[in-house]
């Protein structure tokens, strides 16, 4: 995977939380750790699922922001490339050797369009989403300037209420413009229903996706009638991939969180009413935290607070234990309820974050652990790449 192996000059506890070969107990906290066995099982499972259903899987890099994790998804899970949300994020992956990059977002600022149009010079195939005909003209001009080619996905707003057009006529108009524009290629449709990914009920998610799939089918039919059949119809996430893959319309999935999982995704249910983190996917990402104070007999204070995680989707839970509970946090402190006084100062706990994506974005490194030993230390390659 071309993972970093030379850590000479790195000081543990200042530059980096751990080094390969260390015991898990020696890792400096708070930091992100990956259970490599669970991660690899998740990646293989999604790859096997996509293959069995005749689908491409393009893993979403906005979740992990790591070139090394993406390469693992490609080598173990057959991922065909990476999805990104920002130009700088796409640059981090392309510069890191990822050869197929889709920006699942609109790029409108002239300077960003210029950078996007230069990106194929790294050797990567680059595709971007569009929801406005004027954007086609700007992208074409920049690609001509740099002598590059860009792929175009027309984005449909199929319920997220964000970017994307809402009518089949608008889809056809933009696709025609892309097909006619120099240095651009119309490749397909982006149709991701983000608003329903975290709905607890399987039936509620299915109802939202049924409506989205019907909308996308109308657009596909309209394109085919104009001789513009899309090569790819792309979308789907960890909370919905089974709907898109059985739709007969989509042929590419964009799942991301399945690889790591988080507390919020764990709360949603499958068709049998089971949590999807109990059999479908495993928790592979944890915030490793240490007890720093136990001055009160029923409360332990740990070193993972707001600056170590995102709590927009709720507080983390303590993994593998029901005798202690993470109950509140401030900038640098987390408070763990310890009714029986079982914790001691310097004990380490694994926390499952409420929301993996923004939690990963506040850390510099992933520490990969197997059988209690540090095996890998990977940089969060696109950390802070929000431009």
Swiss-Prot record:
Where Mg(2+) binds, per the record, is at 355, 357
Give the cofactor note text.
Binds 1 pyridoxal phosphate per subunit.
Show the CDD domains listed in the entry: PLPDE_III_LS_D-TA
**Catalytic activity reported:** (3S)-3-hydroxy-D-aspartate = glyoxylate + glycine; (3R)-3-hydroxy-D-aspartate = glyoxylate + glycine
Residues binding pyridoxal 5'-phosphate: 85, 238, 256-257, 265
Describe the outcome of a gene knockout. Answer: Abolishes growth on glycolate or glyoxylate, but the deletion mutant strain is still able to grow on acetate, succinate or glucose with comparable growth rates as for the wild type.
Q: List the molecular function annotations (GO) for this entry.
A: D-serine ammonia-lyase activity; magnesium ion binding; oxo-acid-lyase activity; pyridoxal phosphate binding
Q: What class of enzyme is it?
A: lyase
Question: Is-annotated flag, keyword Ribonucleoprotein?
Answer: no
Q: Its Gene Ontology biological processes? A: D-serine catabolic process; glycolate catabolic process; glyoxylate catabolic process
Q: Which residues carry this modification: N6-(pyridoxal phosphate)lysine?
A: 62
Q: Which Gene3D superfamilies match?
A: Alanine racemase (3.20.20.10), D-serine dehydratase-like domain (2.40.37.20)
Instruction: List, alphabetically, the InterPro entries matched.
Output: Ala_racemase_N, D-amino_acid_metab_enzyme, D-ser_dehydrat-like_dom, D-ser_dehydrat-like_sf, HdxyAspAldBhcC, PLP-binding_barrel
Family matches, as SUPFAM superfamilies: PLP-binding barrel (SSF51419)
**Protein family:** Belongs to the DSD1 family.
* Entry function: Catalyzes the condensation of glyoxylate and glycine into (2R,3S)-beta-hydroxyaspartate ((3S)-3-hydroxy-D-aspartate). Is essential for the growth of P.denitrificans in the presence of glycolate and glyoxylate since it functions in glyoxylate assimilation via the beta-hydroxyaspartate cycle (BHAC). Is also able to catalyze the reverse reaction in vitro, i.e. the cleavage of (3S)-3-hydroxy-D-aspartate, and that of D-threonine to a lesser extent.
Subunit: Homodimer.
Q: What is this protein called?
A: 3-hydroxy-D-aspartate aldolase
């Amino acid at each position: 995977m071309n993972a970093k192996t030379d850590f000479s000059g790195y000081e543990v506890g200042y530059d980096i939380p751990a080094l390969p070969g260390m015991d898990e107990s020696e890792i400096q906290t708070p930091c992100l750790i990956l259970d490599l066995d669970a991660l690899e099982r998740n990646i293989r499972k999604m790859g096997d699922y996509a293959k069995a259903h005749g689908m491409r899987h393009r893993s979403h890099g906005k979740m992990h922001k790591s070139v090394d994790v993406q390469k693992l998804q490609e080598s173990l899970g057959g991922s065909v490339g990476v999805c990104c949300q920002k130009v700088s994020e796409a640059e981090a992956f392309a510069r890191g050797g990822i050869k197929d990059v889709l920006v699942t977002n609109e790029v409108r600022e002239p300077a960003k369009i210029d950078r996007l149009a230069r990106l194929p010079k790294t050797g990567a195939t680059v595709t971007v989403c569009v929801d406005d005909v004027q954007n086609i003209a700007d992208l074409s001009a920049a690609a001509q300037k740099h002598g590059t080619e860009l792929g175009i996905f027309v984005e449909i707003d199929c319920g997220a209420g964000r970017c994307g057009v809402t009518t089949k006529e608008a889809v056809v108009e933009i696709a025609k413009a892309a097909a006619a524009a120099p240095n651009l290629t119309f490749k397909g449709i982006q149709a991701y229903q983000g608003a329903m990914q975290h709905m607890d009920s399987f039936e509620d998610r299915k109802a939202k996706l049924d409506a989205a799939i019907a909308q996308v089918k109308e657009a596909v039919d309209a394109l085919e009638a104009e001789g513009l059949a899309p090569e790819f119809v792309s979308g789907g996430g960890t909370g919905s991939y089974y709907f898109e893959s059985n739709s007969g319309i989509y042929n590419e999935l964009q799942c991301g969180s399945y690889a790591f999982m988080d507390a919020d995704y764990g709360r949603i249910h499958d068709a049998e009413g089971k949590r999807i983190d109990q059999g479908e996917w495993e928790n592979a990402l944890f915030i490793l935290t240490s007890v720093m104070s136990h001055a009160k007999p029923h409360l332990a204070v740990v070193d993972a607070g707001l600056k170590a995680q995102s709590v927009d989707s709720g507080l983390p839970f303590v993994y593998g234990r029901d005798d202690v509970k993470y109950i509140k946090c401030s900038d640098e402190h987390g408070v763990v309820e310890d009714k029986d006084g079982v914790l001691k100062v310097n004990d380490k706990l694994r926390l499952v974050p409420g929301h993996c994506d923004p939690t990963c974005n506040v850390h510099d490194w992933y520490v990969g652990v197997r059988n209690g030993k540090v095996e890998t230390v990977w940089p969060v390659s696109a950390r802070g790449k929000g431009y």
